[in-house]
UniProtKB/Swiss-Prot annotation:
It is found in: Cell membrane. One of its GO terms (molecular function) is ephrin receptor binding. This is Ephrin-A1. One of its GO terms (biological process) is regulation of angiogenesis. It is a lipid-anchor; GPI-anchor. Belongs to the ephrin family. The keyword Glycoprotein applies. A lipid is attached at S182 (GPI-anchor amidated serine). Cell surface GPI-bound ligand for Eph receptors, a family of receptor tyrosine kinases which are crucial for migration, repulsion and adhesion during neuronal, vascular and epithelial development. Binds promiscuously Eph receptors residing on adjacent cells, leading to contact-dependent bidirectional signaling into neighboring cells. Plays an important role in angiogenesis and tumor neovascularization. The recruitment of VAV2, VAV3 and PI3-kinase p85 subunit by phosphorylated EPHA2 is critical for EFNA1-induced RAC1 GTPase activation and vascular endothelial cell migration and assembly. The lineage of its organism: Eukaryota, Metazoa, Chordata, Craniata, Vertebrata. Residues 183-205 form a propeptide.
Length: 205
């Protein structure tokens, strides 16, 4: 019984500790206009990519932004060009989805044990780039993710208070036509634990 409650408490704590960092992946997001768009995370945090989305017919289908996203090495990040060996990480290819924008999520695990999954390390940086699927514009969209830890590839001597808080992408930024809002409800981690509690109690002999 004590083991059960300890496990449940550990689950609640781990869910509550994880942060979600949202990035609106489209060319009208001004954060992509800089060459060093960076998100700071910790192990077990999530990265949520919000794909381009159009809620009306003001943009021709051929001009709607659609992307293939890659997780690449630093050299490919600088060139904004994936190698043939780089497998596509995600596809943003439903710009008119009725349920709202597609959300693609990455969890920064230390070790997953799955062959096709990526293991992430503290103190390392990881790089995402995209290539357009149909539209002609070939603007480079790229993102650097730095995982907090003992070793950092790009240490800063005097990080300011804002950087210490590991900021996510600003959800209030004014992003243009390719972003919509999903009506799907979101549950906080504690709410998930409360919902799971009755089911887990039924399993106790």
């Amino acid at each position: 019984m004590e083991f059960f409650w300890a496990s449940l408490l550990g689950l609640c704590c781990s869910l509550a500790a994880a942060n979600r960092h949202t990035v609106f992946w489209n060319s009208s997001n001004p954060k992509f206009w800089n060459e060093d768009y960076t998100v700071h995370v910790r192990i077990d945090d999530y990265l949520d990519i919000i794909c381009p989305h159009y809620e009306d017919n003001s943009v021709p289908d051929a001009a709607m932004e659609q992307y293939t996203l890659y997780l690449v090495e630093h050299e490919q990040y600088q060139l904004c060009q994936p190698q043939p060996k780089d497998h596509a990480r995600w596809f943003c290819k439903s710009p008119k989805a009725k349920h709202g924008p597609e959300k693609l999520s990455e969890k920064f695990h230390r070790f997953t044990g799955f062959t096709l999954s990526k293991d992430f390390k503290e103190g390392h940086s990881y790089y995402y780039i995209s290539k357009p699927i149909h539209h002609q514009e070939d603007r480079c969209l790229r993102l650097k993710v730095m995982i907090a830890g003992k070793i950092t590839h790009s240490p800063q001597a005097h990080p300011n208070a804002q950087e210490k808080r590991l900021p996510a992408d600003d959800p209030e930024v004014q992003v243009l036509h390719s972003i919509g809002h999903s009506a799907a409800p979101r549950l906080f981690p504690l709410a998930w634990a409360v919902l799971l509690l009755p089911f887990l109690l039924l399993q106790i002999p």
